[in-house]
Amino acid sequence: EVQLVESGGDLVKPGGSLRLSCVASGITFSGYDMQWVRQAPGKGLQKVAYFNDALSAQGYADAVKGRFTISKDNAKDSLYLQMNSLRAEDTAVYYCAPWQFEYWGQGTLVTVSS
């Protein structure tokens, strides 16, 4: 059974930082290009960041570029998202998923509010 478990979400003030984690089990993690996506209240899914395993390349949505950093540790079957300079508009449930969206976790809630 494939499981993706996200954690690290919290209530944080604007300008603060959080580090999200996603731990995978049941898949060969090193074979997957992974991404973080988010769903803000009342809105659709938005791709936030991706990590291309073969190239060790990263890409970011314009809204988070320069503030968020994605990283992947295949030895720990883990994906991370370092989030700095958080804004109210970053409030959302954050999910990790393979590039083709084969699997989903339960998500972790990030709330940015003063």
UniProtKB/Swiss-Prot annotation:
Gene Ontology CC, one term: extracellular region
SMART domains documented for this protein: IG, IGv
GO molecular-function term, one example from the UniProt record: antigen binding
Superkingdom of origin: Eukaryota
One matching Pfam family: V-set
Record-level GO BP terms: immunoglobulin mediated immune response
Protein's UniProt keywords contain Glycosyltransferase: no
Key words, A-Z: Adaptive immunity, Immunity, Immunoglobulin
Domain called Ig-like: residue spans: 1-112
Note: This chain was isolated from a myeloma protein.
Protein name from the UniProt record: Ig heavy chain V region GOM
Protein's organism: Canis lupus familiaris (Dog)
